[in-house]
Amino acid sequence: MQIAPLLHVGRGVMAIIGGGGKTTLMETLAGELSKKGKVIITTTTHIYRPEQYETLLDADEAAVSAALERSGIVCVASQAESGKLCAPRLSMGTLAQLADFVLVEADGAKRLPLKAHASHEPVIPEEAQRVIMVIGIDGVGKTIRETCHRSALYAQLALVDEETVVTPQLAARVVNAEGYGDRVYINKVESASDYEAAQAMANEFSCPVIAGSLHQGVYVCLH
């Protein structure tokens, strides 16, 4: 089963934001979309260097074009002092001219399922035609303090304290309060109880909602 059609991923630039699972979603989409055209994966913040793709650092247009001809999927970025990769020297608009699909990880969550966004986040490229909000269903049933990146801000947006247990409705309340994303993907939905929680969450959104498991490769449209 493929997730790209359910998320209506078209050609051009797409940003992925939210909780844990963004990198896996980006890599899953890259694999699917590479059957339809050339794919660039990149970031506007920081990501780990992907082992399975050719990575170009501070490359010019000619180098990117040549790599895409060789590989079909290429990571384009710069080297950050932290050892991670950061935003590339080339603009997103330029990358979109070189590849059919540009997938951008535009957020960080410290590998936690849920997050609230500080004033400087997310870093969504102005060229983005689709913004996917990722939510980890494994954050439901745990306290905000233990499962949310920027937990104090998350609690503030939810109008509760950090020891409050996250419910599907509470998680949706925070996403709706922030107003980011035109699609929601609920990840790690792998059991009947996960599905029930995901459906309860989806009922709170007005935008399309997809739920599933990137690990299992199974997805369903909930809204």
Model regions: which residues?
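N-terminal phosphate/diphosphate-binding loop that engages ATP/GTP or pyrophosphate donors
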Residues: 30-79
